[in-house]
């Protein structure tokens, strides 16, 4: 273990020990979660979901008792690319930011604190939100090592919000916050058997969140039920003058928990993206059970023959690479003090100089490609084309032409074996989340069962700013669901 990683591990251990020694009435809930972190995250199954805990969590829990409201006292974990005031750094999983203690809350965190939410700690993630290399292992970071899937310890937790997904599934907090550029909330939710919601881009602030792409980035809630995810979203959503994308958020947000308990599928027309269910018979069979439950709940199902446009993936990558170079530099230069790393080029140089910490398992080919992606005209053309393909000619057209309110497909295939040597092996061809990611539209993943003990989620995708109705559809599906949701085994697959 590198000496700096050992130091962070000691910080985590010391923080847990200090909080755990408090009086019985101080932070009872926090203490319960910390005991679970100690016994199944640090030792035993060693999930490696939590990077560090907040040493003031018990005090925050006590203070929250004076706050009235449904979020007061709720204990959450936060993905470690989101800034949280206090002693913990925001690293994005990289040793390049191991000293990035900014002393400030991201606006979305400030909103949650005002509502009485207790920040328990920071979660591991796919380093740089899975945008450093095309050969990466989801859930691995230089700082945090490899996060494990609590349903099958040798299987991927998906990413990049790996620790948030695994942590919620393992009961290490009431809920967690993840971030998504394309699949980074919904895929870990699916793989870990929990609910994950990627809201409409612009509903939640991205200020003081380590960026990949302002075109697609958004934080989102991860929880064990749609109701809990909606409640957490209530505290997260809102306008931020520092994030122009959120200009309309205060006017368009609502109480996302309203109507969940009585939401019905009766008469709701739902588009079925059959091709996006892949070719694996067991995944298709599980999807068919979910469709049967939707139909039994009163939904009208409309089969849709849709194929992803060949240009969409290419244009999306062009956008992400260009944004990465620009947005990362802006973030680094905006850090308090005199940050030593001020550009993507600086990060590339850091990784080369610290290859023993960062480059042992995979390289930085995406970083290097992004550094060379400087053609703004090509970027603007790719952005316009990808928005057209995913939005106007994608989700918008599919909803309107077929007269449906939502689109459904499996979120992902079963979790694949962790492979640090050659990287992720998700060749399932399952999922439609890229449409929602590129268009910036809402996408909910709700557990729909498991294949051989490996959870799979049902994706529900809706129109822009139709977040509340997407959540209502998810809650109605939860009630209609007849398939058992798997419980984490905390064992290797097949044991």
Role assignments for model-derived ranges:
Residues 1-60, 286-298, 349, 372-373, ...:
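An N-terminal boundary/leader segment
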Residues 76, 82-83, 216-218, 245-337:
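Gly/Ser-rich, acidic/histidine-flanked active-site/gating loops
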Residues 34-46, 55-58, 62-66, 113-114, ...:
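Sec-exported extracytoplasmic/periplasmic mature domains
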Residues 72-92, 259-273, 322-390, 445-455:
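Short helix-loop capping/hinge segments that flank enzyme active sites or metal/cofactor-binding pockets
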Residues 118, 169-274, 288, 293, ...:
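Structural helix-boundary/capping segments
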Residues 25-99, 128-130, 248-252, 257, ...:
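Short, well-ordered alpha-helical
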Residues 33, 73, 366-495:
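Glycine-rich, small-residue loops and helix-cap segments
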Residues 72-219, 244-247, 273, 407-424:
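Short glycine/serine-rich loop/turn segments
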């Amino acid at each position: 273990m590198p000496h700096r990683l050992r130091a962070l591990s000691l910080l985590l251990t010391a923080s847990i020990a200090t909080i755990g020694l408090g009086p019985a009435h101080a932070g009872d809930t926090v203490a319960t979660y910390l005991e679970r972190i100690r016994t199944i995250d640090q030792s035993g199954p060693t999930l490696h979901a939590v990077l560090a805990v907040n040493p003031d969590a018990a005090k925050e829990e006590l203070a929250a008792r004076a706050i009235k409201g449904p979020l007061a006292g709720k204990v959450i974990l936060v993905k470690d690319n989101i800034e949280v005031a206090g002693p913990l750094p925001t690293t994005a999983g990289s040793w390049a930011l191991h000293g990035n203690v900014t002393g400030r809350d991201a606006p979305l965190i400030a909103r949650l604190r005002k509502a009485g939410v207790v920040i328990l700690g920071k979660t591991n993630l796919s380093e740089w939100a899975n945008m450093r290399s095309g050969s990466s292992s989801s859930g691995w970071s230089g700082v945090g090592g490899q996060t494990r899937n609590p349903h099958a310890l040798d299987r991927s937790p998906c990413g990049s919000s790996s620790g948030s997904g695994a942590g919620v599934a393992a009961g290490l907090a009431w809920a967690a916050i993840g971030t998504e550029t394309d699949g980074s909330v919904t895929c870990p939710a699916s793989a870990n058997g929990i609910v994950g919601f990627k809201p409409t881009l612009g509903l939640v602030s991205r200020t003081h969140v380590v960026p990949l792409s302002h075109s697609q980035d958004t934080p989102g809630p991860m929880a064990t039920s749609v109701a809990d995810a909606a409640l957490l979203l209530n505290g997260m959503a809102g306008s931020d003058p520092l994030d122009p994308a959120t200009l309309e958020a205060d006017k368009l947000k609502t109480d996302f928990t309203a109507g969940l308990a009585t939401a019905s599928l009766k008469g709701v027309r739902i588009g079925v993206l059959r091709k996006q269910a892949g070719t694996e018979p067991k995944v298709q069979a599980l999807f068919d059970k979910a469709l049967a439950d939707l139909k039994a709940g009163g939904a009208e199902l409309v089969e849709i023959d849709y194929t992803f446009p060949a240009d969409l993936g290419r244009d999306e990558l062009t956008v992400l690479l260009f944004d990465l170079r620009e947005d990362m530099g802006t973030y680094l230069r905006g850090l308090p003090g005199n940050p030593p790393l001020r550009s993507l080029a600086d990060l590339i140089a850091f990784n080369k100089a610290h290859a023993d910490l960062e480059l042992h398992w995979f390289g930085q080919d995406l970083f290097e490609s992004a550094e060379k992606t400087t053609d703004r005209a090509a970027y603007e053309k790719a952005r316009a084309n990808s928005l057209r393909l995913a939005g106007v000619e994608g989700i918008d057209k599919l909803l309107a032409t077929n007269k449906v309110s939502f689109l459904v497909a499996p979120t992902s295939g079963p979790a694949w074996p962790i492979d640090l040597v050659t990287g992720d092996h998700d060749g399932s061809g399952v999922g439609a989340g890229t449409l929602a990611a590129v268009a910036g539209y809402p996408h909910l993943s709700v557990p729909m069962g498991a294949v051989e003990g490996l959870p799979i989620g049902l994706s529900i995708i809706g129109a822009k700013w139709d977040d509340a109705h997407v959540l209502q559809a998810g809650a109605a599906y939860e009630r209609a669901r007849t398939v058992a949701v798997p419980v984490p085994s905390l064992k290797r697959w097949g044991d």
